[in-house]
Amino acid sequence: MDLIHLEDVDGNRCIVRVTGRSQPGVLTGHDILRADVLVSASFVDARLEMCLSPQDLSSWQQSLAELTQGGNATLGGARGLALGIHVNDERAVSVWVEDPDRLTTTLMIRPPGDWTDEHRGRLQDVREAWPREVVETAPMAYEWIPDHRH
């Protein structure tokens, strides 16, 4: 399921495809999601791995809500790969991907005009497919949310 899917007619694209839970059934990793980051342009074609925490998804939601021309939205970065989107104008965004171990690149994409609304829906779809099922009751202390069936 794609959390991010930015693509244009020139073949430039950046996709963050959520593939599942990182450690299903393990309290400390159950709510961490695995994702593939697919980046493609005339000068790059890469597949990278990313982990997304519930906090990453909340931060992404906040970034999308506040995004305006000249603004930025970011995802990840605390534990490795980071991705950012800068709104150049109403027709183009710059997407940067930084994986400290493998790749740093920036590409320009001209997404459809309603891409932010579409991505709010994508975030909701991801949250519905993999709902939060663990709560941190104290620093480094976790419990299943009541009514969770593990």
Locate the predicted segments by residue.
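Short, hydrophobic/aromatic-rich segments at coil-to-beta transitions
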Residues: 1-4, 68-72, 93
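Generic "edge-of-domain/loop-turn" microfeature
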Residues: 11, 23, 42-44, 57, ...
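Short amphipathic beta-strand/extended segments with alternating polar/hydrophobic composition
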Residues: 15-19, 45-54, 85, 97, ...
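DNA polymerase processivity clamps
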Residues: 21-26, 68-88, 134-148
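Intrinsic, low-complexity N-terminal interaction/targeting segments
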Residues: 27-34, 77-103
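Mixed-charge, glycine-accented linear interaction segment located at domain edges/termini
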Residues: 100-150
